[in-house]
Regions:
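Short C-terminal tail/terminal secondary-structure segment
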Residues: 99, 150, 229, 240-260
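Conserved glycine-rich cofactor-binding loop
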Residues: 9, 16-17
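Active-site helix of classical SDR
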Residues: 125, 161, 169
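Substrate-binding pocket helix/loop in short-chain dehydrogenase/reductase
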Residues: 100-102, 106-111, 209
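Alpha-helical segment proximal to the catalytic Tyr-Lys
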Residues: 130, 174-175, 237
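Short, small/polar-rich loop/turn modules that mediate ligand/substrate recognition or access, typified
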Residues: 85, 177, 182, 239-241
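Residue(s) in the substrate-gating loop at a strand-loop-helix junction
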Residues: 145
């Protein structure tokens, strides 16, 4: 399957590293124009833009904190100025926060995770849908997680935000469908990125993690990117309102492989 997205205008939030960077590259390789959103490390965003341009693609880098609705409004107006609209939004920006049991969690830290992961996704989806609904086309794809459904001790804000992303995806999909717009999500499992280097670089922790994954390996960012590119293309034109999990079987309760 050779997915093509020529002429499509895409925004990927949190795109200067990890899964976001892989998605941006995947969209560009498929022919889309890509706006790379970042908060910090502008040099990484600029490097990604240059990588895309060297492949004869089109990309721009735009700094914005998605947890700030005013900044999100400015972000979308910059895309309007560059490309006169948007066809694809990838809500990828997210943080997991410091580990702490619920009753020991700092309230401000808890709130920050919700503001970035949930409010940020909503603010961006809201701006995108304002543009997609009148043109009667477009796709919003939210990056969720296996922790949309799997509890994760010490990360109550993160799991709450991802569970909420699942229902936000369904509700916005229901609202937008009559206008020709799809809304869906992808739920990565354990993906080998810098954010979890402390796990995959530690043999003991890695062994424990792999025991939870039936395919017995971590995923690569490019594996998420390939799924995302397909889902936002016309090859998935009948898919909306669902989270597609890309997790090596992590959600299939591997402990029951041999009878529990």
């Amino acid at each position: 399957m050779n997915v093509r997205l020529e002429g499509k205008r895409a925004l990927v939030t949190g795109a200067n590293s990890g899964i976001g960077a892989a998605i941006a590259l995947g969209l560009a390789d498929a022919g889309a124009k890509v706006a790379i959103n970042y908060v910090t490390h502008p040099e990484a965003a600029d490097k990604l833009v240059q990588t895309i341009k060297k492949k004869h693609g089109e990309a721009i880098a735009i700094q914005a904190d998605v947890s700030d609705p005013k900044a999100v409004g400015i972000l979308f107006r910059q895309i309007d100025k560059a490309w006169s609209g948007i066809d694809i939004l990838i809500n990828n920006a997210g943080i997991d926060g410091a580990r702490a049991l619920g009753w020991k969690t700092d309230i401000d830290a808890w709130r920050k995770v919700i503001e970035v992961n949930l409010f940020g996704a909503f603010y961006c989806a809201r701006e995108a849908l304002k543009r997609m609904v009148p043109q009667r086309s477009g796709v919003v794809l939210n990056t969720s997680s296996v922790h949309e459904e799997i509890a994760w001790s010490g990360h109550s804000a993160y799991t709450a935000s991802k569970a909420a992303i699942g229902m936000l995806t369904k509700t916005l999909a229901q609202e937008a469908a009559q206008h020709g717009v799809r809304v869906l999500a992808v739920g990565p499992g354990a993906i080998k990125t810098a954010i979890n280097h402390s796990v995959w670089s530690n043999p003991k922790r890695l062994k424990d993690l792999l025991g939870k994954i039936p395919l017995h390996r971590m995923g690569e960012p490019d594996e998420i990117a390939r799924m995302v590119v397909m889902l936002v293309s016309d090859d998935a034109s009948y898919v909306t309102g669902r989270t597609i999990f890309v997790d090596g079987g992590m959600m299939d309760y591997p402990g029951f492989t041999h009878g529990g």
